[in-house]
Amino acid sequence: MLTVDDVLEQVGEFGWFQKQTFLILCLLSAAFAPIYVGIVFLAFTPDHRCRSPGVAELSRRCGWSLAEELNYTVPGPGPESQCLRYEVDWNQSTLGCLDPLASLATNGSPLPLGPCEQGWVYDTPGSSIVTEFNLVCDDSWKVDLFQSCVNLGFFLGSLGVGYIADRFGRKVCLLATTLTCASLGVLTAVAPDYTSLLIFRLLQGLVSKGSWTAGYTLITEFVGLGYRRTVAILYQMAFTVGLVLLSGLAYILPHWRWLQLAVSLPIFLLLFRFWFVPESPRWLLSQKRNTEAIKIMDHIAQKNGKLPPADLKMLSLEEDVTEKLSPSFIDLFRTPNLRKYTFILMYLWFTSSVVYQGLIMHVGATGGNLYLDFLYSALVEFPAGFIILVTIDRFGRRYPLATSNLAAGLACFLMIFIPHDLPWLNIMVACVGRMGITIVFQMVCLVNAELFPTFIRNLGMMVCSSLCDLGGVLTPFLVFRLMEVWQGSPLILFAALGLVAGGMTLLLPETKGVTLPETIEDAENLQRKAKPKENKIYLQVQTSELNTQAAERDASQGTAQQK
């Protein structure tokens, strides 16, 4: 029986059509990077001190350098220098230029300190939401809330957007979420106050991850089996390209509103090209829209300069006797193997997020060059993608994924015992952990897409990856609260999560060389060592034997297994 993969073998598994579509969708993947980690530049916190009226004039009159001004007018080092000020009238004429506060101190008692009632002075040539809305000192938690809103949006949007993609199609989801994401990005850039900023970021989080995931699912369903893993990994590496470009763009545009506009407006241009990207033929077949699927397969053949199979058009004339498959959350937990896949993938996504972001927070707390530090951390992800491309065909998915989890967990465990006077060793081990968890992040997307049947593939991706977003919401609190107990406490948590994830990965089936499952039965059979042609996505109808088995099963259970 003819399958989608059989047709692609004849018309081109990765021809001109797939290459063109892949490059377009990679632009979407790169555009998602500023939404996910743009907080680094949008909300950076520069050195700051209380604004005290009269200090600037006194400094000019006395000819002080910046270091002298800070020494004379700002309280000692630590939080006091950023959140408190001397309660002194700096405009009084009796103040001298040499130790001006000496004459005000009586009996050697310290001068009274007060809050920053006049705002703050920030040592930066640019701006961020921190400097514009004064999100420092008692209001510093609002920066964490700003980032949590994005991750909360990812989490909430995972469920609804995933259902839309499986119910109404990948293309409809892609167009709707991309348009909404771009519009909300522009609204964020012109937000008049902090409250509206939170609302726009939350709403953008609701749709932006769905847009990225719809593109990921679409491109993996367009290509043949031999190229599926390659395009999946390269699609994620396009995200890393977005990280690199973001660091350069942020350096050129140090003002957050201009930077936000610069990363949002180009998304509108992608919409014009997305309009000409066809719907996934695999999804159309799962919805029993065979005629449309065959037209798209014929279009792919024409674009690739190949002739479609001679029996392709005959398939649309055969009677469609199968039942239309509609996505349901229950399907993710309906059968034993699918239930196991869902829970394990949820844990893997959660672990990936906590360890990935946690390592950045724990190691990246050193005050270096913001742009270079971000660039170096992004470049580490390119070797991770290369390692996947080299190993995934030789060793499959399961063992590299398990090994990467174990490597990340072991690296975090070793960092606990590295002395503080060996920072270079700490950075090297941390890079190994970062590379390992990056490999996990990239591979779990591929494995997630390969384990679920077509009609719930996008839903399965969104539901499982929603745990990644939940981890993103919790990670700042986990890291900083545990560091208050002991600086190495977060590393113990990261090590435990990574090592357990490595063991749980071995419970998943190997999907190397196995075609994408169409039905729940196909997904259940992945656990068995099936022949290469056993699990296929059919262009026409399922065999009468499967229909008979399904009818007998439905009759015995009293309910339909699938809508």
Curated annotation (Swiss-Prot):
Keyword 4Fe-4S: no
Glycosylation sites: 71
Keywords (A to Z) from UniProt: Cell membrane, Glycoprotein, Ion transport, Membrane, Phosphoprotein, Transmembrane, Transmembrane helix, Transport
GO BP term, pick one: acetylcholine transport
Positions in the Extracellular compartment: 43-144, 193-196, 254-257, 364-371, 419-423, 481-487
Known regulation of activity: Phosphorylation of the transporter leads to changes in its substrate affinity, resulting in a regulation of the transport activity. In contrast with rat ortholog, ASP uptake is inhibited by protein kinase A (PKA) and C (PKC) activation. ASP uptake is also endogenously activated by calmodulin, the calmodulin-dependent kinase II and LCK tyrosine kinase. Inhibited by cGMP, most likely through a cGMP-binding protein that interacts with OCT1.
SUPFAM superfamilies in the record: MFS general substrate transporter
Transmembrane segments: 22-42, 145-165, 172-192, 197-219, 233-253, 258-278, 343-363, 372-392, 399-418, 424-446, 460-480, 488-508
Domain of life (superkingdom): Eukaryota
Principal place of residence: membrane
Catalytic reaction list: 1-methylnicotinamide(out) = 1-methylnicotinamide(in); dopamine(out) = dopamine(in); serotonin(out) = serotonin(in); (R)-adrenaline(out) = (R)-adrenaline(in)
MF terms (GO), sorted A to Z: (R)-carnitine transmembrane transporter activity; acetylcholine transmembrane transporter activity; monoamine transmembrane transporter activity; neurotransmitter transmembrane transporter activity; organic anion transmembrane transporter activity; organic cation transmembrane transporter activity; prostaglandin transmembrane transporter activity; putrescine transmembrane transporter activity
Keyword Ribonucleoprotein (UniProt): no
Chain ranges on the Cytoplasmic side, renumbered to this chain: 1-21, 166-171, 220-232, 279-342, 393-398, 447-459, 509-563
Subcellular location: Basolateral cell membrane; Apical cell membrane; Lateral cell membrane; Basal cell membrane
More about this protein: Involved in the uptake of clinically used drugs including diabete treatment medicine metformin, neurotoxins 1-methyl-4-phenylpyridinium (MPP(+)) and iobenguane and platinum-based drug cisplatin. Also involved in metformin efflux transport. Metformin competitively inhibits OCT1-mediated thiamine uptake, leading to a decrease in hepatic steatosis. Plays a role in the anticancer activity of cisplatin and may contribute to antitumor specificity.
PANTHER family: SOLUTE CARRIER FAMILY 22 MEMBER
Entry's free-text remark on domains: A large substrate binding region with partially overlapping binding domains for structurally different substrates is formed by several transmembrane helix domains (TMH) including TMH 2, 4, 10 and 11, and it is alternatingly exposed to the extracellular or intracellular side during substrate transport. Contains one proline-rich sequence (Pro-Glu-Ser-Pro-Arg) that is required for transport activity.
Protein name: Solute carrier family 22 member 1
Annotated source species: Bos taurus (Bovine)
